[in-house]
Amino acid sequence: MPHDAEAHYCGLPDIYRGEDVPLSNIHHITWDDIDGKTPFRENKELQKQLLKLMKKYPYMAHNAAFEDSWFKIHLDGYAEARRAGKIIVIDSRQICRSLDADVRSLPRESAPAALENWARRRGTLAADANEQHLGLDDTDLMLRTVQAEFNLKNLFAK
């Protein structure tokens, strides 16, 4: 069970100054949130801490190919550790596609395997609520949704 969760804001390279924060309309992160923060690529201590955790515990992400490719580019030592089998990635979207029969019957354009839609079907996200697109909030939603799916399918040991 996850514990002692942390969230870190990292800065952006100066090339983005004077522009909108990329994807701020999705993540709701503003320049005020990241002003004075070290960019992730330059924050070697945070990278070291994250890589250590990733080698110790598997990590789960919804559409994990995105995180996996991002970390390969931006996290020193990740690609080598991943290739050596020291980092295990679990994709909750693949869990959804494999276990949730609704995915096969709903129209593809309705994005049935999207975390928000899957969570609504499993009752872990209210019909009038939205996925936050913020690390800890979405991680909590993802884990509760996976647990709900596993409970529905009686996949937990008794």
Locate the predicted segments by residue.
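Conserved non-catalytic scaffold segment of RNase H-like nuclease domains
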Residues: 1-75, 109-123, 133
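Short alpha-helix plus adjacent loop in nuclease-associated cores
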Residues: 90-110
